[in-house]
A protein has these predicted regions:
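Alpha-helical metal-binding/catalytic segments enriched in His/Glu/Asp
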Residues: 118, 140-189, 232-262, 294-298
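Generic non-transmembrane alpha-helical segments
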Residues: 22, 26, 43, 47-51, ...
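Residue-level signal for inorganic ion chemistry
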Residues: 27, 195, 296
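Acidic/His- and Gly-rich active-site-bordering loop/insert found
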Residues: 4-149, 158, 174
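Short coil/turn connectors at secondary-structure junctions
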Residues: 98, 109-114, 143-145, 173-178, ...
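Acidic/histidine-rich catalytic neighborhood of metal-dependent amide-processing enzymes
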Residues: 154-226, 273, 278-282
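Midchain, well-structured core segments that form catalytic/ion-binding scaffolds
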Residues: 202-312
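Active-site beta-loop-alpha junctions enriched in small/polar residues
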Residues: 32, 60, 119-121, 185, ...
Length: 312
């Protein structure tokens, strides 16, 4: 017996794999970028309510003052698209322009508050429609050019819904409260802050996040106690005199120097300079300012476990 589970003799979650597959393919087919995930939110909320869960959405989920990187025009267009796709107008109105969802399942017994976080947004890339790819052959490839779940958030959201379904069915064997958070706008590190500011993680005894990967074997998981795939975005400005000397040279040197920073020997790290911008007005007048858009990502050391989950 642990502080969250009364018994280890519990049904195999593999029995819910058909539900998982259906959710994942539905989300993969209709990808939406950060802060525009209205169809995805409807899919999540509909599934949770079908389980009998009470769901939190809209301003009860998001702190507007903490929102970053939200394009109002894209949000408005996404709402119109969702309405055309069959999402009820009353539901869209209730969201008040905010995406994402959360639910807390109470077992009715004392125990910890365990929070699971799952992302729902996609990446702005086009999916290959070449025959031979599973999504193409089975008919669930992205229907939206320029948008794709290439980072696996369709599987993350489907995992969250499947786990919520299992917890709901087995709550009599569990203790405490289990909260499921379906986060919008994870790409670009934009959505989490607004949810944390609203209190979604407050009082949590355990906070779990997860990410799929192809670098480990079937039935194997790995875990880290913190910092895994942590990322940071940095904007750097270089200023100089508007003469034949140029800030571009300084920016270029900094770009190369960043790549020479030694990587951590016990983990994985990446540094990417994604944008370089100059404000030159004349060909002869060299840029006086150069702007860097940088991102860093790192993975802390982790442990591996084998699992006994059987295939469907």
């Amino acid at each position: 017996m642990t502080d969250t589970c009364l018994s280890r003799d519990l049904p195999d979650i593999a029995d819910d794999l058909p539900f998982f597959t259906d959710c994942r393919r539905r989300l993969h087919r209709r990808p939406e970028e950060g802060w525009t995930e209205f169809e995805s939110t409807w899919t999540v909320v509909s599934a949770l309510k079908a389980m009998g869960c009470e769901v939190v959405t809209g301003a009860d989920l998001i702190e507007p003052e903490a929102v970053m990187g939200r394009d109002a025009a894209k949000v408005e267009a996404a709402q119109r698209r969702a309405l055309e796709a069959g999402v009820p107008e009353a539901f869209l109105t209730s969201l008040d322009g905010w995406t994402g969802a959360a639910t807390t399942i109470d077992t009715g017994r004392p125990g910890p508050l365990t929070v699971f976080r799952f992302e729902i947004d996609c990446v702005c890339v086009s999916e290959s429609l070449e025959p031979g790819r599973l999504p193409v052959d089975l008919g669930f490839a992205s229907e939206r050019p320029g948008l794709m779940h290439s980072c696996g958030h369709d599987m993350h959201a489907a995992t969250g819904l499947t786990l919520a379904r299992w917890v709901t069915a087995n709550r009599d064997a569990l203790c405490g409260r289990i909260r499921f958070v379906f986060q919008p706008a994870e790409e670009g590190v934009r959505g989490a802050k607004a949810m944390v500011a609203r209190g979604l993680a407050r009082g949590a005894d355990y906070l779990w996040t997860q990410h799929i990967t192809t670098s480990i074997h079937e039935n194997e998981i790995f875990a880290s106690a913190g910092g895994f795939l942590a990322t940071e975005k940095i904007d750097i400005s270089f200023h100089g005199s508007s003469e034949f000397g140029t800030a571009v040279t300084a920016a270029a040197h900094a770009t190369l120097a960043m790549q020479a920073i030694p990587r951590h020997s016990e983990g994985a790290s990446r540094i990417c300079v994604g944008t370089l911008e100059a404000d030159a007005e004349k060909a002869r007048s060299r840029p006086t300012r150069r702007r860097h858009g940088c991102a860093s990502k790192c993975a802390a050391p982790f442990r591996r476990w084998r699992t006994s989950c059987r295939r469907a």
